[in-house]
Regions:
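RNA pseudouridine synthases
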Residues: 2-332
Length: 332
């Protein structure tokens, strides 16, 4: 079992234990750090600690026993994945909307991980027993490009890139409303909602979160944006845009407040928006450094059919409103 020894620096005094651990290259993520602490793999000054929130002092000596990858007890399942690239180290693919990334309570099977295990037969186990190969996630109802690691070395390299925010990620988002500016940035810390624990919110002492956005097209009552992530927090784009008054169309958690705009639209367009049962968010671009090939790689993929159909309906609605078509065009 590999070991990390580390002496807390003066400028690191007051940090949470899991916060400092997650900055180390050997630790895949903050959730991994928390799991290692709770599993009694971490000592401070020769004493085992079990609280990830333990505040550190200048001069504390940390000793971390890196646990070996857990054996995988998951059932491979057949499924259709559009693969953009694959080699012995990693696989790049398109996750469809509606697919949960990894098993959890209530989703023990039928996940992306189960499908990857069937296709790849072997994945990096460093992310934990239920998250083999997973170095980043997309929400269940968000579609788009993902990368998974096939071995531990690649997993560590990719995880560090995500941690250092050097991975290039862009998303296409259809939002309610017309933005006044053509582009901008949202720098607002995120954390758990103080009341609804299923939601994320902008909170004063949350984790740093930065989203850059640019308007691609404005329709009658909606706008199509390209959003680039500088950080990658849970629900980041969804919460940031909603906090600015432009929630994503179809978002069940953060987008309900803008349905009043439907009354200004023709019935077919109104119906299309009402019946779009997921957030209109698609991970369209992904770029990273391939550790095995030692080169930068970039991938792009257009939005899926349901998203394209919605955008076509918005274009027709726009055309009718501008006098370039008739309401009957929307019914075709």
């Amino acid at each position: 079992m590999a070991e990390i020894k580390y002496k807390v620096k003066k400028e690191e005094e007051g940090l949470r234990l899991d916060q400092l651990l997650s900055k180390m290259n050997e630790v895949p993520s903050r959730s991994s750090a928390q799991r290692w602490v709770k599993d009694k793999h971490v000592q401070i000054n020769k004493t085992i600690v079990e609280s990830p929130s333990r505040k550190l002092k200048w001069g504390d000596i940390l000793e971390v026993m890196i646990p070996p990858p857990k054996s995988l007890d998951l059932r491979p399942e057949k499924g259709n994945l559009e693969i953009l690239y694959e080699d012995n180290d990693l696989i790049v693919f398109v996750k469809p909307a509606g697919l949960v990334v990894h098993p959890s309570a209530g989703h023990e099977a039928g996940t992306l991980v189960n499908i990857l295990l069937e296709h790849c037969h072997d994945l990096s186990g460093i992310g934990g027993a239920t998250r083999p190969g997973i170095v980043h996630r997309l929400d269940k109802d968000t579609s788009g490009i993902m990368v998974s690691a096939k071995n531990d070395k690649t997993h560590q390299h990719l995880a560090k890139q995500f941690k250092d925010h050097s991975v290039r990620r862009s998303y296409q988002a259809l939002v309610w409303g017309i933005l006044k500016n053509k582009k901008g940035s949202i720098n607002a810390p995120l954390g758990r909602h103080p009341v609804n624990r299923k939601q994320i919110a902008v909170v004063p002492n949350g984790r740093r979160a930065v989203t850059h956005w640019e308007v691609e097209h404005c329709y009658s009552n909606t706008s199509l944006l390209t959003c680039r992530l500088e950080t990658g927090r849970t629900h980041q784009i969804r919460v940031h845009l909603s906090s600015q008054g432009f929630p994503i169309v179809g978002d069940p958690l953060y987008g309900k407040s803008s349905h009043h705009l439907l009354k200004f639209m023709n019935e077919p367009a109104k119906s299309a928006l009402k019946n779009f049962k997921r957030q209109a968010l698609h991970a369209c671009d992904l770029g990273f450094f391939h550790p095995g090939r030692e080169e930068e790689m970039d991938f792009s993929h257009p939005a899926p059919k349901d998203y394209k159909n919605l955008l076509e309906m918005m274009e027709l609605e726009d055309s009718v409103k501008n006098g370039h078509g008739s309401p009957k065009d929307l019914e075709r």
